[in-house]
């Protein structure tokens, strides 16, 4: 039996539109299905409602990188780095700093 994760997350959000975990999960599901525009809508909403949800910035940047939107990915990483610094999330800070360096030096 296959679980319709998009349906499940959508149902949760219909009951609680501010549920950060469900919003993030829905964005990830859309990303995994290659539906970048829908994923970015969810990541954007997540970041508007929960600006300190650091993982959202990193995963949004990864989705943008995978779809070839490197400039937007860079912008999302810079916002995520600021968020990681603000929240003291050193692991996310290191990960996103590394991703940003890879974008700046793709041949390195």
Each model region followed by its residue ranges:
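Canonical positions in the second alpha-helix
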Residues: 11-12, 45-46, 80
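Structural marker of alpha-solenoid helical repeat scaffolds
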Residues: 15, 48-49, 83-87
């Amino acid at each position: 039996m296959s679980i319709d994760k998009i349906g499940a997350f959508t149902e949760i959000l219909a009951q609680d539109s501010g549920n950060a975990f469900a919003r993030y999960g829905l964005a990830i599901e859309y990303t995994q299905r290659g539906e970048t525009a829908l994923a970015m809508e969810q990541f954007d909403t997540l970041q508007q409602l929960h600006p300190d949800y650091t993982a959202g910035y990193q995963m949004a940047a990864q989705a943008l990188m995978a779809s070839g939107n490197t400039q937007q990915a860079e912008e999302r990483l810079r916002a995520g780095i600021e968020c990681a610094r603000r929240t003291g999330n050193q692991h996310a800070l290191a990960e996103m700093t590394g991703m940003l360096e890879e974008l700046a030096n793709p041949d390195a």
